[in-house]
Amino acid sequence: MATEGGGKEMNEIKTQFTTREGLYKLLPHSEYSRPNRVPFNSQGSNPVRVSFVNLNDQSGNGDRLCFNVGRELYFYIYKGVRKAADLSKPIDKRIYKGTQPTCHDFNHLTATAESVSLLVGFSAGQVQLIDPIKKETSKLFNEERLIDKSRVTCVKWVPGSESLFLVAHSSGNMYLYNVEHTCGTTAPHYQLLKQGESFAVHTCKSKSTRNPLLKWTVGEGALNEFAFSPDGKFLACVSQDGFLRVFNFDSVELHGTMKSYFGGLLCVCWSPDGKYIVTGGEDDLVTVWSFVDCRVIARGHGHKSWVSVVAFDPYTTSVEEGDPMEFSGSDEDFQDLLHFGRDRANSTQSRLSKRNSTDSRPVSVTYRFGSVGQDTQLCLWDLTEDILFPHQPLSRARTHTNVMNATSPPAGSNGNSVTTPGNSVPPPLPRSNSLPHSAVSNAGSKSSVMDGAIASGVSKFATLSLHDRKERHHEKDHKRNHSMGHISSKSSDKLNLVTKTKTDPAKTLGTPLCPRMEDVPLLEPLICKKIAHERLTVLIFLEDCIVTACQEGFICTWGRPGKVVSFNP
């Protein structure tokens, strides 16, 4: 393995790298691509994307992967680290004319060895539902492009649903669909359901239920990616206007926002326990945002160009009770210590969530996440307890503030929330740090907006509560938000006036929305390696490997430490 050094060595593509847990190795036999293995001419093409699904096959080899390259879409058995990829036998291959696949997502809930539901978004705005095992096309949504003519940027099944899915477009709109409903032969007409700062949600105005069930307009410019929280209750969106916006998906409330240091945000992901969100974008940074505190807690600088994908590694994220261990020795010795008292993936979430601000027991917490970028580099990062639970928070006055716009003055006279002296961790902020304006509301009802949209169509929306107060913990938080959820439809003139007060992106630097670089900790990557010739577009953490892909159409498997074994061709 080449060492970091001169220009030639710096530009050399790495095939292995070492972290504290051991050696990761590129497995050439586990590389997937087009059958001819010829590098794809990626100029002007949409990013290569990869989706995985496990079919619970009796043979124990139930992993399948789908990837798009140019106008082509492939569906293969994924043999992982143990067996060589057989590129001559794709289960399904499709070549499209006039449009290109841009993204895709499997329904893990309904997947079986005989059937799997795969959504595919396209560059011209359509969404296709296919079954690559049965090799039949089920349905086409937005076929005539009457709903949206712009490129599909992200498509995902709604967690826990067999029929609902969400689609984002470069127009800045998102649409909620039901596979059981048709789209109609004319352009849909909408009526306003909910409106807030820089977002609006509309329902489809129709006598019979039809797609789309809901239309979200979020921010300005393209909506580049969205991600559901691990519990499926919240939705994080990143847009070309540089904003991260986090919504309560069911009640359609804005929970919190964050602004990039520069340029658009391109990617987003949640920590396994749902407490942190990481974004990447055109500022070449990764940014860590606390879901509980609604604030930036760290930035990471390691990339030399735009960050295209961020992802948490649930298999390396850990929490250890007791005194944090001190260590000096070899990687092998560290590996032995690492397995003592460590909880992985499942228990990490439960143990972190059980802790509260009054728990004084020492805890050693490490979240591992990764990023890939257009600079062809893979970076791995550790988010540790000295960042998560700082004893001396940087710029205390800044990090203890709550972002409220001019129409909602908080308790403090200077526009900042009151800090609590002596706390090493900032107190939780209100569940929303932006005014959850609603166009129509009934304070007495506790129904979910999303449930109402799905079950009742348009006619009953006027009676739904659009501002559920269940999560309001303190009366002062309730007052601080001026009970905006109780605005009736008669107050629409005032509401429109309020929603015109948008955050000026140019004025966010130095505020809690976008702290200055010196006001938050700056992370350095554990490793930062050039691993491809072309820009990287995929990063997925699996139990025994890491999967990356580049724009040339090569999907690479990196075996984790101790997982690389002799394989059978």
Swiss-Prot record:
One of its GO terms (cellular component) is nucleoplasm. Keywords: Acetylation, Cytoplasm, Nucleus, Phosphoprotein, Repeat, WD repeat. Residues 450-468 are annotated as: Mediates XPO1-dependent nuclear export of WDR20-USP12 complexes. The modification Phosphoserine is found at S357, S360, S432, S434, S465. The modification N-acetylalanine is found at A2. The keyword Cell division does not apply. InterPro entries: WD40/YVTN_repeat-like_dom_sf, WD40_repeat_dom_sf, WD40_rpt, WD_repeat_creC_regulators. Residues 405-423, 431-445 have a biased composition (Polar residues). The keyword Isomerase does not apply. Residues 405-445 are annotated as: Disordered. WD repeats lie at residues 94-138, 139-210, 211-252, 253-331, 332-426, 427-523, 524-559. Its main location: cytoplasm. It is found in: Cytoplasm; Nucleus. GO terms for molecular function: deubiquitinase activator activity. Interacts with USP12; promotes translocation of USP12/WDR20 to the plasma membrane. Component of the USP12/WDR20/WDR48 deubiquitinating complex. Interacts with USP46; contributes to the cytoplasmic localization of the USP46/WDR20 complex. Component of the USP12/DMWD/WDR48 deubiquitinating complex. Regulator of deubiquitinating complexes. Activates deubiquitinating activity of complexes containing USP12. Anchors at the base of the ubiquitin-contacting loop of USP12 and remotely modulates the catalytic center of the enzyme. Regulates shuttling of the USP12 deubiquitinase complex between the plasma membrane, cytoplasm and nucleus. This is WD repeat-containing protein 20. The gene is WDR20.
